[in-house]
Amino acid sequence: MTHLLQDKIIVRQFNVQPYEPVSLAMHNFTDRRDDKTPDEIWLVQHPRVFTQGQAGKEEHVLMPGDIPVIQSDRGGQVTYHGPGQQVMYVLIDLKRRKLGVRQLVTAIENTVIGTLAHFQIKAHARPDAPGVYVGERKICSLGLRIRKGCSFHGLALNIAMDLSPFLRINPCGYAGMEMTQVSDLVPGVTLDDTSPVLVNTFLQLVGYSAPEFIPWALDVQGEPLPD
């Protein structure tokens, strides 16, 4: 059974969902899971929102204006989510996969680097600043939380979005950090192009061989709606 669970992962496509119900659902999933619960990946876009990580400082939220600021329990500082950005949450039993937190972070960064390479974009990670960069510009943010040996939260990859709200914050706590996105580097690329590559690259790097793809929606309490 353990061998089968190590191979299996459920990939859920949420489309556009408000941040708070999805965050609640991640917490509920993690609190309720046991050693027989398959790992999951959640793909989602969020309406415009700033999320402040556990290490977040108020001075890095410069001019939020009409965009809400929501406290999150992920690692890191403030970032922005909006339509056209692919958020991928990774809900993984690290003990079962024999993965350390640093190994998971590296796998996520390498997933994004490999995905971008598929579109002829040369990207890299930085030891001093988590995430993925093209030159000096940041293209992907990441932040995780570990509970009961299981991960939740994940990455946010800029694909084809309005980047201007990033000017209202110091992204991830870095004043003057410039952001970029896939569609500025390779015109015409969409989430539909990048999302399958992102998921498949992650599955290959972490070693899942039996993905199951399920569309899913949530109610306002963060519970699954029937198909």
Curated annotation (Swiss-Prot):
Known pathway: Protein modification; protein lipoylation via endogenous pathway; protein N(6)-(lipoyl)lysine from octanoyl-[acyl-carrier-protein]: step 1/2
EC number(s) given by UniProt: 2.3.1.181
Keyword DNA-binding: no
GO biological process: protein modification process
Organism superkingdom: Bacteria
SUPFAM superfamilies found in the cross-reference section: Class II aaRS and biotin synthetases (SSF55681)
Stretches assigned to the BPL/LPL catalytic domain: 35-210
Signal sequence coordinates: none
Keywords: Acyltransferase, Cytoplasm, Transferase
Function: Catalyzes the transfer of endogenously produced octanoic acid from octanoyl-acyl-carrier-protein onto the lipoyl domains of lipoate-dependent enzymes. Lipoyl-ACP can also act as a substrate although octanoyl-ACP is likely to be the physiological substrate.
Remaining remarks: In the reaction, the free carboxyl group of octanoic acid is attached via an amide linkage to the epsilon-amino group of a specific lysine residue of lipoyl domains of lipoate-dependent enzymes.
HAMAP family, per database record: LipB
Descriptive protein name: Octanoyltransferase
Protein's organism: Pectobacterium atrosepticum (strain SCRI 1043 / ATCC BAA-672)
